[in-house]
């Protein structure tokens, strides 16, 4: 998982210097495009999107657009859903993937 709010993240020092608050975008790798597909199908609160401009939780599969990323790479932008509901949904979707 990548999130600039974690001290072990390579972007942590830059984020700490440049940001007052750390954004709600995290990245993780599920290994394969198939697992990403299963994750997105199972997640009922997450919408597949290429733009992070709304208030809902969205996920983007960068490899499908030709970006130089792993087929299992996902960027997740956390929305304003109830935290407990979102965590439960993401946990269940990851288990399903």
Predicted features by range, described:
Residues 19, 48-49, 67, 74:
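Short, flexible coil/turn micro-motifs enriched in small/turn-prone residues
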């Amino acid at each position: 998982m990548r999130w600039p709010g974690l001290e072990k993240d390579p972007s942590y020092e830059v984020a700490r210097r440049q940001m007052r608050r750390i954004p709600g975008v995290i990245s993780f790798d599920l290994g394969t495009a198939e697992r990403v597909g299963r994750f997105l199908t199972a997640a009922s609160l997450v919408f597949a999107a290429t733009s992070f401009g709304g208030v809902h939780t969205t996920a983007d599969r960068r490899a499908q657009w030709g970006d130089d990323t792993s087929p299992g790479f996902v960027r997740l932008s956390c929305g304003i859903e109830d935290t407990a509901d979102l965590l439960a949904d993401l946990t269940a979707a990851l288990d399903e993937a």
